[in-house]
Amino acid sequence: MKLSNVFLAAVVILTCVCVFQITAVPFIQQVQDEHHVESEELQENQHLTEAEHRLTDPLVLFRTKRQSHLSLCRFCCKCCRNKGCGYCCKF
């Protein structure tokens, strides 16, 4: 009985060692993967800061010259002294 328990324990340990060796990543590859992840994060952060800069840029918030050929009227109710619904051009 003891011999079978020792044999079973040896088989389990040997199996674990084999599995861990197969799934192990070499140190050089792990360092390269970490460097690749860091460079991707840096690129993402740089892209986000550019997007935030475009959103907070005050020149973006100002309207450009209005096109004179575009109508600035819209259909609305109870606006521009209209008692009912109609076109309002106060914009």
UniProtKB/Swiss-Prot annotation:
Keywords in alphabetical order: Antibiotic, Antimicrobial, Cleavage on pair of basic residues, Disulfide bond, Hormone, Secreted, Signal
A molecular function GO annotation: lipopolysaccharide binding
GO BP field: antibacterial innate immune response; cellular response to progesterone stimulus; cellular response to steroid hormone stimulus; defense response to bacterium; defense response to Gram-negative bacterium; defense response to Gram-positive bacterium; intracellular iron ion homeostasis; multicellular organismal-level iron ion homeostasis
Tagged with keyword Electron transport: no
Subcellular location: Secreted
Disulfide bonds, paired cysteine numbers: C73-C89, C76-C79, C77-C85, C80-C88
Maturation propeptide residues: 25-64
Main location: secreted
Domain of life of the organism encoding this protein: Eukaryota
InterPro entries: Hepcidin (IPR010500)
Secretion signal span: 1-24
GO cellular component: extracellular region
Membership in a protein family: Belongs to the hepcidin family.
Functional summary from the UniProt entry: Seems to act as a signaling molecule involved in the maintenance of iron homeostasis. Seems to be required in conjunction with HFE to regulate both intestinal iron absorption and iron storage in macrophages. May also have antimicrobial activity.
Protein name, entry field: Hepcidin-2
